[in-house]
Amino acid sequence: MAHPSQLGFQDAASPIMEELLHFHDHTLMAVFLISTLVLYIITIMMTTKLTNTNLMDAQEIEMVWTIMPAISLIMIALPSLRILYLMDEVNDPHLTIKAIGHQWYWSYEYTNYEDLSFDSYMIPTNDLTPGQFRLLEVDNRMVVPMESPTRLLVTAEDVLHSWAVPSLGVKTDAIPGRLHQTSFIATRPGVFYGQCSEICGANHSFMPIVVEAVPLTDFENWSSSMLEA
């Protein structure tokens, strides 16, 4: 999860987030090199006296400053398109969960189970126990098995919402009357925090998302206990 004074991204907990981190570093390096080159050219132009005010045509220079930006954009666009297609793929999910946004809480339905559904509300600050995080904890976490492809169906009951968990590299809009689909694989056990990322009313800041990734045996025990409750 995020820490005070953190400048970088949260630690990746899914293959997609790993790809996004690599793409961020790749793009940042390209932007840094371009900025350095442009700053160097501007500095040279402002300081040198070797200028030709009568120069009207320079096809070689024009060709260079046309081809180089095109190559740079292609180098940035190709990895981006690859990740875009990877994020759109849903290959043989082991578990399907439907997340429904409400004002101002989330509800979850595990479609692989007949009667496994629950609401997830933020725990008020006065009810937090030592070690819990303010404005991020919920009474019912969305539990998923780690290292298992999970499909997430996202919609909303009333207004626009957005289901987002940065560590998993997932952000999907929840729109009333529409069903959006995404997928993720939690590569390690842990608790991953997110929040609604679409302004949805007065209590928009108070509808957090908590995903808990556990081993498959623990998930089966949890689902059995939820069905018996």
Swiss-Prot record:
Q: Which InterPro entries match?
A: CcO_II, CcO_II-like_C, CcO_II_C, Copper_CuA, Cupredoxin, Cyt_c_oxidase_su2, Cyt_c_oxidase_su2_TM_dom, Cyt_c_oxidase_su2_TM_sf
Membrane topology of this protein = Multi-pass membrane protein
Which compartments does it reside in? Answer: Mitochondrion inner membrane
What does the UniProt function comment say about this protein?
A: Component of the cytochrome c oxidase, the last enzyme in the mitochondrial electron transport chain which drives oxidative phosphorylation. The respiratory chain contains 3 multisubunit complexes succinate dehydrogenase (complex II, CII), ubiquinol-cytochrome c oxidoreductase (cytochrome b-c1 complex, complex III, CIII) and cytochrome c oxidase (complex IV, CIV), that cooperate to transfer electrons derived from NADH and succinate to molecular oxygen, creating an electrochemical gradient over the inner membrane that drives transmembrane transport and the ATP synthase.
| One of the GO BP terms on file | ATP synthesis coupled electron transport
One term of GO molecular function: cytochrome-c oxidase activity
Q: Which Gene3D superfamilies match?
A: 1.10.287.90, Cupredoxins - blue copper proteins
Q: Which UniProt keywords apply?
A: Copper, Electron transport, Magnesium, Membrane, Metal-binding, Mitochondrion, Mitochondrion inner membrane, Respiratory chain, Translocase, Transmembrane, Transmembrane helix, Transport
Subunit organization: Component of the cytochrome c oxidase (complex IV, CIV), a multisubunit enzyme composed of 14 subunits. The complex is composed of a catalytic core of 3 subunits MT-CO1, MT-CO2 and MT-CO3, encoded in the mitochondrial DNA, and 11 supernumerary subunits COX4I, COX5A, COX5B, COX6A, COX6B, COX6C, COX7A, COX7B, COX7C, COX8 and NDUFA4, which are encoded in the nuclear genome.
Q: Could you tell me what reaction this enzyme catalyses? A: 4 Fe(II)-[cytochrome c] + O2 + 8 H(+)(in) = 4 Fe(III)-[cytochrome c] + 2 H2O + 4 H(+)(out)
Q: Which PANTHER family match?
A: CYTOCHROME C OXIDASE SUBUNIT 2 (PTHR22888:SF9), CYTOCHROME C OXIDASE, SUBUNIT II (PTHR22888)
Q: EC class of this enzyme?
A: translocase
Provide Mitochondrial matrix-side residue ranges: 46-59
Answer yes or no on keyword Magnesium: yes
- Lineage of the species this protein comes from: Eukaryota, Metazoa, Chordata, Craniata, Vertebrata
Mitochondrial intermembrane face of the membrane: 1-14, 88-229
Its main localization is mitochondrion
What gene name is given for the protein in this entry? mt-co2
Output the superkingdom of the source species: Eukaryota
Fetch the Pfam families from UniProt: COX2 (PF00116), COX2_TM (PF02790)
Q: Which positions does UniProt annotate for Mg(2+) binding?
A: 198
Q: According to the record, how does the cofactor bind?
A: Binds a dinuclear copper A center per subunit.
Name listed for the protein in its UniProt record: Cytochrome c oxidase subunit 2
Family according to the record: Belongs to the cytochrome c oxidase subunit 2 family.
